[in-house]
A protein has these predicted regions:
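Thiamine diphosphate
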Residues: 1-173
Length: 173
């Protein structure tokens, strides 16, 4: 009918745009950087590499915060954040309770307010406890608000340890 066609045309833009970021921070607009490798070989624990990189990021970006279970005091379960709470303060690197859905919800709220949060979920198999918030809230926010809001949240986790039934699972198969 004419009425349906008119309605479809009127709402085409609203329902078919802003599915992906169109901002300057879009992955499609970030220039690619070529990898550079040193000829010098040096064995370093991965946790040290991670810690040093997070340290540099926290120093460079005052709006960056890292939080999750055991992130603050002990520097995460594998010490990839070791000493960073002492160095950067307990408002930038801090612990949360053991509720993955709450951690993701906090991250969304912080991102909506202009901060750049890194929400740590201890193990990959625990993401399932936050899947509804990830799929219904975080993943669709920009689309649902017609590009009016975005929540640039980084979720950090680990998995595939293959050490028994706990902390080794993966929703990826």
């Amino acid at each position: 009918s004419v009425w349906i066609k008119k309605l479809l045309n009127e709402n085409k833009l609203r329902y078919n745009s802003h599915l992906y970021s169109e901002s300057n921070q879009s992955l499609r607009k970030i220039p690619q950087t070529e990898l550079e490798y040193s000829n010098e070989k040096k064995d370093v624990d991965a946790r040290i590499i991670l810690r040093d990189n997070f340290d540099k990021l926290l120093s460079k970006y005052p709006e960056l915060i890292i939080f999750g279970e055991d992130c603050g005091k002990i520097g995460d379960v594998n010490q990839g954040l070791e000493g960073l709470q002492e160095k950067h303060g307990e408002h930038r690197v801090f612990d949360t309770g053991i509720r993955e859905a709450t951690i993701i919800g906090q991250g969304i709220g912080l991102a909506l307010r202009g901060l750049r949060p890194i929400a740590e979920i201890q193990y990959l198999d625990y993401l399932l406890y936050a899947i509804q918030i990830l799929s219904d809230d975080l993943a669709t926010l920009q689309y649902r608000t017609f590009g009016g809001q975005k929540a640039p949240l980084i979720i950090r986790t680990r998995g595939h340890r293959l050490e028994g039934i706990w902390h080794s699972g993966s929703p990826m198969g």
